[in-house]
């Protein structure tokens, strides 16, 4: 089954046809602060895509970058380096800041069940590749050098800005009020490839180059690391919708002028998480971290569930009341699945522990096929989540099949369902003493002679002690209430 995604380049749904070596790249974090939940919504969307591709039998090679240098406080070459600014404010070196927040980012990802990339590309480790890309662009006439910096000449690239629908004659007009005008540029849309000391005197991370001692731009970093790792073309480039109008069109310009051919088939963008009708932003100081949510009593997986309730191309408004509703829904789901699990026979438990794909009832089940169709059609995750609830409520499905399907769906949804159920089962595990054994046997005999009053009395006795009796084909099980 082919997966279709909305391609920002073509403004239409496109099939992903490369099954054998699907090359996917995601713009990772600039590691100068904790990732906020707006950032993490994008990484959850990207995680859902990677897992959907793999469930649909694509052989995915997934890379993500870490920007530890050269990302300015503005996208138009203005401001100062975010990492340098954070290091100065905290009294640390840029290397200490980068290392600390890289670890913090992947810690948050682990809490959210976000898959670790096949390759993490750290910008400061690819300086030689970046310099090589600029050399080739320079040789081919796409750059100019002025006032100590190497610029990309956008007028030399006919396709510049097409993905964003940019008219070069009007470029930057809507942003003039907030952009520091760089008089060194030939065109407003031109951007720096390599900075030297002439631009920012306090830049700590610098390298020697043919153009002087300096550092690369954010746009050059992503393009050069891609070209180094994947060697040539790319199937899917992922990122937030805020990257469409500057960063990603600059990446395209660099890569296509370097390769002299089309670089990436498909660009896919996730929409904003918003608060009070504004996107969440560190620069606006209106952001919430995973640690903040945990301090308020939420599991990171409550937030993941919340993100699953909206399509990735739809803005999602964050409120704590909505998050609480998702927390309740996720806990209800776990409670229902735990109940199903506790009712399984030993034989069914053995089946459950096998790989779901080896059980015919799953692969041929209408719910499973419907789930594949949902994720394959532009990641229709809210509808896929609704199918999970349909399974739980379907009285025609056995407890075993419900669990098999739920756990299979969770290979993509990643709500920690199996782990959560097993944790609840272990928590509810009861060591049954002789008195309990005697009462359970007495209740069994009472039911056989149709003395339901006595059977109910024994059930109520257990309940008064904080236990619940569950009748199964193999006898009565006891769990904590």
From Swiss-Prot:
Binding site for ATP: 282
Residues annotated to bind Zn(2+): 27, 222, 247, 251
Cellular compartment(s): Cytoplasm
Cofactor annotation comment: Binds 1 zinc ion per subunit.
Main location per the UniProt record: cytoplasm
Positions occupied by motif 'KMSKS' region: 279-283
Disulfide bonds: none
Listed name of the protein: Cysteine--tRNA ligase
Natural source organism: Borrelia hermsii (strain HS1 / DAH)
Taxonomy of the source species: Bacteria, Pseudomonadati, Spirochaetota, Spirochaetia, Spirochaetales
Encoding gene per record: cysS
């Amino acid at each position: 089954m082919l997966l279709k995604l909305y391609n920002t380049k073509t403004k239409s749904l496109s099939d992903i046809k490369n099954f054998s070596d699907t090359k996917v790249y995601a713009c990772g974090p600039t590691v100068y602060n904790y990732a906020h939940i707006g950032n993490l919504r994008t990484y959850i969307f990207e995680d859902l895509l990677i897992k959907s591709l793999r469930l649909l039998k694509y052989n995915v090679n997934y890379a993500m970058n870490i920007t530890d240098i050269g990302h300015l406080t503005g996208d138009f070459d203005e401001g100062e380096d975010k990492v340098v600014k954070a290091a100065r404010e905290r009294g640390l070196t840029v290397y200490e800041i980068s290392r600390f927040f890289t670890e913090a980012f992947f810690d948050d990802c682990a809490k959210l069940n976000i898959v670790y990339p096949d390759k993490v590309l750290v910008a400061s480790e690819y300086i030689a590749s970046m310099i090589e890309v600029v050399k080739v662009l320079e040789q081919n006439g796409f750059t100019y050098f002025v006032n100590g910096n190497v610029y990309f000449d956008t007028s030399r690239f006919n396709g510049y800005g097409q993905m964003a629908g940019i008219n070069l004659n009007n470029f930057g007009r809507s942003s003039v009020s907030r952009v520091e005008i760089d008089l060194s540029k030939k065109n407003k849309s031109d951007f720096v490839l390599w900075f030297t000391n002439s631009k920012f005197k306090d830049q700590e991370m610098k390298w020697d180059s043919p153009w002087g001692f300096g550092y690369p731009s954010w746009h050059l970093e992503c393009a050069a690391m891609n070209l180094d790792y994947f060697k040539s073309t790319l199937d899917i480039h992922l990122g937030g919708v805020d990257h469409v109008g500057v960063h990603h069109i600059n990446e395209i310009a660099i890569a296509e002028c370097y390769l002299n051919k089309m670089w990436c088939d498909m660009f896919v963008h996730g929409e904003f998480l918003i608060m009070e009708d504004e996107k969440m932003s560190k620069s606006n100081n209106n952001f919430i971290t995973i640690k903040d949510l945990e301090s308020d009593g939420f599991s990171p997986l409550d937030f993941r569930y919340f993100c699953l309730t909206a399509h990735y191309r739809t803005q999602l408004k964050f409120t704590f009341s909505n998050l609480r509703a998702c927390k309740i829904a996720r806990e209800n789901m776990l409670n229902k699945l735990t109940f199903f699990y506790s009712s399984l026979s030993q034989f069914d438990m053995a089946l459950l522990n096998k790989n779901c794909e080896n059980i015919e009832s799953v692969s041929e089940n209408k719910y499973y096929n419907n789930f594949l169709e949902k994720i394959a059609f532009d990641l229709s995750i809210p509808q896929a989540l609704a199918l999970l609830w349909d399974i739980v409520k379907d009285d025609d499905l056995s407890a075993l099949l419900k669990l098999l399907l739920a756990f299979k769906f969770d290979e993509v949804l990643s709500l920690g369902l199996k782990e959560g159920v097993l944790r609840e089962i272990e928590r509810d595990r009861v060591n049954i003493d002789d008195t309990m054994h005697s009462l359970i046997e007495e209740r069994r005999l009472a039911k056989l002679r149709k003395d339901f009053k006595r059977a109910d009395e024994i059930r109520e006795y257990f309940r008064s002690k904080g236990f619940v009796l569950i009748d199964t084909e193999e006898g009565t099980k006891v769990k904590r209430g």
